[in-house]
Structure formats: C-alpha cells, structure tokens
Amino acid sequence: MTSTSARPARRSRAPLAITAAIIAALVIAFFIFAGFYADVLWYDQLGYLGVLLTQWGAGIALFFIGFLAMAIPVFVSIQVAYRSRPVYAKLNSQLDRYQQVIEPLRRLAMFAIPAVFGLFAGVSASSGWQRTLLWLNRTPSGTTDPQFGLDTSFYLFELPFYHAVVGFASAVVIISMLGVLATSYLYGAVRFTGREVRISKSSRIQIAITAGVYFLLQGVSIWLDQYSSVVNTANGGLFTGAAFSDVNAVIPGRTILAGIAVVVAVMFIITAAIGRWRLPIIGTAGLIVASILIGTAYPAIVQRFQVEPNERSLESPFYERNIEATRAAYGLADIEEIPYDATTDTTPGALREDAATTANIRILDPAVVGDAFSQLQQFRQYYQFGDNLDVDRYQIDGRVQDTVVAVRELSPTNTGTSWVNQHLVYTHGYSLVAAYGTQRTSDGQPVFLESGIPASGDLGDFEPRVYFGEDSPDYSIVGGPESGDKVELDYPSGVDGADETYTTFQGDGGPKVDNVFKRLIYALKFQSEQIFLANQINDQSQILYDRDPAERVGKVAPYLTVDKDPYPSVVDGRVVWIVDGYTTSDQYPYSQQTQPLVPTDRINYIRNSVKATVDAYDGKVTLYAWDTDDPILKTWQKVFPSTLKPIADISGELMSHLRFPADMFKVQRAVLGKYHVTDPGSIYSNQDLWTTPNDPTATTEAGTPASLQPPYYLTMQMPGQDSPRFSLYSTFIPPATQDTSRSVLTGYLGVDSDAGSTAGEKAADYGKLRLLTLPNDDTIPAPTQIQNNFNSDTNVANQLNLLERGGRTSVVRGNLLTLPVGGGLLYVQPVYVRSTGDTSYPLLRKVLVAFGDKIAFEDTLDAALDSIFEGDSGATAGDEDVVPTTPADGAAGDGSTDGATDGGTGSTPTPAPTASPAAPAQDVQAALDAANTALQERQAAYASGDLVAAAQADQRFTEAVQRAYELSQQQ
C-alpha cells in the first residue's frame, strides 16, 4: 500500500523539477544574453558595431569549423570501426563485461564523444580569430628575409596560421586514431593473444590510413619548421634567427626528415592494401633514428666541432642579419649617431648658444607636483588629481610652452554612499588644469596658465566637463529633457563656493536606457536593481560606462597594444585624451626578441601605428592610421574597413599635441642597449653593452633603486638640430658586473617628439632618433653619480638640513634632467619642500645644477646656471624673473595647508615681510597690514563674484597671518 502511494508522489515531483530546470536555464540564458546585448548597444552607440560583429562572426565561424573539423572525423572513425567489427569475435570475459556496460549507452556515446571533443576544438579554433583574419587579409611588406628570400609577411601572417592548421589537424587525427583503437579493441577487431596482436582487415585498413595521414601531417609540420628557424632563438638564446648550424645542418636536416615522414606515410598506405606491418614499422623506426641523427646529433656535431672553434668568423654573417633585422623591426634603422666629446670645463657664457634650450628647461616635476595641484586646484573633496601628471605643450603669446597638465576628475570614494549620489549626481569631473613647466611663483607654487572653477586662463573657451577619464565612476546615468530638473552636480559656485551648479548631459555618450527592457538589461549587467527602479531615469537617459580612455580604445581596436598612459589636451574646444596604439609581432625574421611591454609577452617587432583620441565629454573614439607603412596595420584596415581615419583628417591643433610615445621609446632604448653597435664581433662578444641607469630619485625603503630612470620630455636643441624641438630623451651607462659598477655616461638618446602643427601632415623629423656617443675614456658622471655628488656636497647638505627644519618638513627631490648643452652635459634637479602634515603639498624651493664636477644650489635655475658658469652662463632660464620669498630660518613655505584656502591660481602672491634674527615690531605690523589688505581684497572679490581673485587674496591672507605669527615668536 505504501509503495503504491509513493509512486504518484514521485511522478508528481518530476514535472516540477523539469519546470524548475527549464526556468533556471532560461534565467541563465537571459543573463548571458544581457551581457551580449549590452555589448551590442555599447558598440553601436560608439559607431564601432562592425568591429564587434566581425569578432563575433569570425569567432562563431571558426567555432563551427573547428567543431565540425573535429567532430565529423572522430564520429566517422568510430562509426567505421564499429560497423566493420567482427560478427563473431572471440572476446575474453573482461571485454564481454565491458560491452555489457557500454552497449546501453553506445548510441549516446557515439554522438557525445565526438561532440565533446568538437566543443573543445571549436573553442580552441575560435580563439584564433585574429590569426585567421590576418591570414585571410595578409598584405605584402615589400621586404624579404635573407635566408629564404620570402616576403616578411609570410612570417607575420601565413606561417603562424599554417602551424595552427597543421597542429589542429594533427590533434584531430590523433583523437580519431584513439577512437578507432578503443572501438576496435572493445569489439574484438584488435585482439591481444599472448605475444601477438591480431587485427582484422577492416581495422588494419582504417588504422593504417589514419596513421598515414598523421605522418603526412608531420612531414608538413617538419617542412614548416625550417622556416620557423629564422624566428626562433639560436646559439643558446644569444640572438634570434637561423645561425650557421641552423642554415647548414638544421634546415637541410628538416628537409630530409620531412621527406622521410612522407615516405613513412606512403608505407602505411601500402600496408592498408597489402596487410603487412613490417614495412611501416621499419619506416617509423627509421624516422625516429633519422630524427636523432639528422635532427639532433648532426647539428650538435656541426656546432661543437665546426662552429665553436671558429664561431666569431662563421657566425658573423648571421649576426649581421640579426643586427639589420632588429634595427629595422624596432624602428632603429635610420638612427643618427653623433660622436659627442663632452667637456667638463665651465667657462663664462658657455650656454650662450643654448639659450633657447635653457629657457625651456622644465623645473616642474609632474611626478611630484600632483599634491600641489590637488591643494591649489581641487576645491572640493569630491574632486581629485592623479599622482603622476602629464607633460604637454601649448602656444602662449606666440611661443610654444612646455606645460604640466592634469584633469580635475571625480574622487569616487568621496561622492557619498547612496546610489543616487554615486551614479546620478556625481557624474563628471571639471576642466583641465595646466601649469608652466618652466616657471614657479616666488613661494614655489606652480604658475597656472589654466585653472579655477569655472575654468579661466590662456587656453580659450572649451567644453570643461569630463565624463570620460582615467578615474571616472564605473557607470553614470545622465541626460534628460532641457526643460527638466538638472540633477548632475556641475561645479561649486557662489561666495566661498557655498552654492552648487547643476547641469544635464547634452551629448551622445552612451547607450540609451529609454525603455524598461534596456533598464533590465543594464540592471543585470551591473547587478543593481536601482537601474530598473529609479524614478529619475527618463526616456532621454543614457548610461555611460567603460569610461577609461585606454580601455575604450582597446575595445574598438582589439588588435592594438594600447599605451596605458593617456594624456589630456585641449583640442579644438574640447578636452580630449590622446592614446597611442601599437602593432606588435614575435614573428619578424631574424629580429631579436624582447619582453619590454608585458612581462609575459615576447615581441620582436613594434610600430606606433595608431594615434587615438577619446573625447572627455561624450567619449567619442577616433582612430588615426599613423604609420601608413606598417603591413600589420594595413592588414587590419582590410579586416575593419572605415574604422581608421587617414592622417589627412588630423587637425593642426591636434597635430600640435601629438608626441612620440614614451612606451615605444622605452622599447627602443632597451634594444639599443645592445644594438647601438653594428659590428657583428661586438654583438657576439657582448663587449659594448649599455643599460639604462636606475632612477636616483626612486628608491625602496631599504634604499635600493626601485626602477629604471624614465625617459623625460623636454624642449631642447640637440646636436644635429637647427632649432629646439619637443623631445624625449634617455641616457646610457655600462652594465654593472660582479666586479665593477661604473656610473659614467656612455650614450645619450633623444627622439624628435614634435609632430608639428600642420593639419594632415606630420613634421618631417618626427620620430628621428639621435644617439650621442661619448668616448670610452671620458668619465662624464651618470645620473646616479650626480645624485651621490649632490648628497655628499657639504654646502648642499647643510642647506637641506635647514630646509628640513628638524623633521618638521621633508625635502623631495624632483626629476634629475640631463641636457647636452655648453659642449657638455648639464644636470638639473628641482628640490621641493613640504611639511609633514596630511594636507601639505610640495613647494619648489631650490634647484640643483651640476656640470662636470661643479655643483650649484640656488633658489632659482637662472641663478644656479650663472653660479656654475662663473657668474654668467650666457643664457637665462624660465624662472629668471622670480624673486623667491626668504623663509625665516629656512623654515617657511613648506606647503602646509593647515587653515589654508581651497586652492590657488599660481599667480605670484605679494611677498610677506622677511624675518630678521630679532624681528622688530614694525615687521610684525607690516605682516598684519598685509593680512588686513588681503582680507579686504578677498571680501571685495567675493562681492563681485570673482572666485579666482578671491582664492588669490585668501592665499595671501593666510601667508601674511602665518608670517606675523612666526615673527611674533622671534621677539
């Protein structure tokens, strides 16, 4: 009775379980669909839907090709083996039991096994969509490899594809063979009887043909390997490419082995017909022996007994190939080498011919002044500036000025915790801030040429709102009718910034969320029910996400390696992020492989092929084909037509802000450390290696170097140039060994980074590399040695101790710049002082200069240059008009903002009275009078609504009060 009643209960639960499973599957499917559909909306809004569909189309097509190419042969192999099984096979008891277990599942297994392998094969094949599209759209490069005389496009586009196809086909044959053997064994077509193996005729034919196909594929693979020798490392990794033993032993050997493999394949086909296994077994053994003798032993013998005794002379032609290919692949072929016999003598007027360079020496360090930008220009806690700012240039009053720039972005951690605040109210940053790189105020602050809220300065009118930046919120929902309520916080306004201005996004920056379905899609994508439920979202709302400039470029141009350091510029009335994109390969014949960009990737070819811009207001991405000779870029232009614009479409203003990328330069300097010489003997012996010095200003807690010295942007005139150009430079020193470590300069590398300002035409010398080579017997100190000289100089040490005020302030050393001027090498390092308070910021108080073995430590760069060149350098610096304030006891001006204002403008404040050893009462009164005047000016500025003037007056008021307090303490 009990068992009878239980059966209906179990039956009644079955439909419920099935229904639940179906619902769960539908929910999961909809989640997956939501992700795909959100991608479609994002790409479609940006105008790059074709990129996504091409990726998906190629991936899906390759998936089905891979699935069918694996599943069909495996299925056919198993089916043929099963259908040709012996009818009355003699099976042992164990096989009989296996059959009893398998037989009920046989039909399912015969379909499931090929399908499972097909799925894995499809996924693997789809991941090679880039390789396949490159092969289908391959473009000749016009250059040939020196060994086989093939166009380098064969190695860049064809050889990787052929290897992948042969490897995939080999995997298909192996899995098919395993299926044949397993089926034949289970059903008695292959039997082990003692020492004998009995194979039925049908199985023999199938196994032999399958083996023949496999060896035929191995012959093709071995044949292709001879071409791979010119892109593989040789001589124990000393260089990339085919060396003497490769050319004279390995390549001929592989040709022979490929022929033997084909012969073995024919032997297996013959066996399928005649039924004798002896012949292919002997052939297989012969192939193995030949592989050992011809493929391994013979090249080793040639290397050991022919090459090593005469290695330098025999390998010399192949090192020449390696040198030529490496310099071509990394853009070093046209480098101009200039011998530079640097002097260390200082004479009056030595810099007169370099006056244009000294006037452009940047004393503002973008890696240090981030906190100064924050304290002087942040204004509100919900804004922030990055730690490392960027270097750009603008034409001010007819003169191009190097500047340090940053975007005032939102600080996501200070926008409140409510969903409305984080995603509807705090949606964007505000404006670009720029400071002169060559100037400072009298108290060491940056001199801003564009600053404040609302933005004002020398850059003219531009759209200041920054919806897309490096620190933008993960997503924001913006937009609405012009007549509706404005909910997006724009910027602080009113007296003391007590009021706030609101705005509504009016651009086309993200997918519309104008219906319930799209809101549901994005609620699932971002796992936030508020997107679906919020009443503030209307039919004109847009959702902005994936807002990082580098990320946006990487998504619309998936074939690029994207520079991770975009920089902002004001271009044609908009703030835009400029992003560099690189095409790379590891298949350039004979070019040396390196790991410069990503530690896990090896490359031996790189081009800065694309310049991209991302509009900071609406996120629009524009790609420009920059290196029109790059065959990889040409190929991708065929894959994604109409996604890249020609150089002719670049405006003159945008062109003036494009620069040679630092990441590309780092790759080139790393390669040039070895390949600055063109003599094969020097490359072979590694006798003249160079390396980049460590950054003397970046150390770990243990005092050891933390990183290599970065390249620096400067406007300067190098030897070989007829006028100063915006440049990027780096220095070289000998590498340290176990016995020696010489901190002397061996080379100075500079590249012309100025693209010009002509619309649609880059400057003729853009990207021109110049290498100053110093004589080996010169002992020009390198940056690390100069830093040691600064630190050990008694006068410098005493003044630094005064600046540190017994621990109440700290000294921050800025970037140590090296300039080839005055017939030698000039070192310049700004010195900043900041208090130990949480709200302090660095002030530029001193400048260190070195030339040869002489050191100067002065308040301004202009004074330091005169000091080091015996009172008259013959040139002026950008800070020549600065009259620094004199800190009391070396103490004032530490950048503390305790009780200070929201920010400053960078205009030179009225200097407060200087303290004397025993400050008289009139000095205190003068300071109080200055404070009273500044207070009245602040009140007047607020009354007129001039926030910039109010901030300036507020800063002067605070400084005067602080000065009065310090003077009163000395009485």
Curated annotation (Swiss-Prot):
Domain of life according to the entry: Bacteria
Membrane topology: Multi-pass membrane protein
Positions of region (Disordered): 687-706, 874-924
UniProt organism field: Clavibacter sepedonicus (Clavibacter michiganensis subsp. sepedonicus)
Stated name of the protein: UPF0182 protein CMS1887
Subcellular location: Cell membrane
Upper classification of the organism: Bacteria, Bacillati, Actinomycetota, Actinomycetes, Micrococcales
Keywords: Cell membrane, Membrane, Transmembrane, Transmembrane helix
Bias (Polar residues) ranges: 687-702
Record's GO cellular component terms: extracellular region; plasma membrane
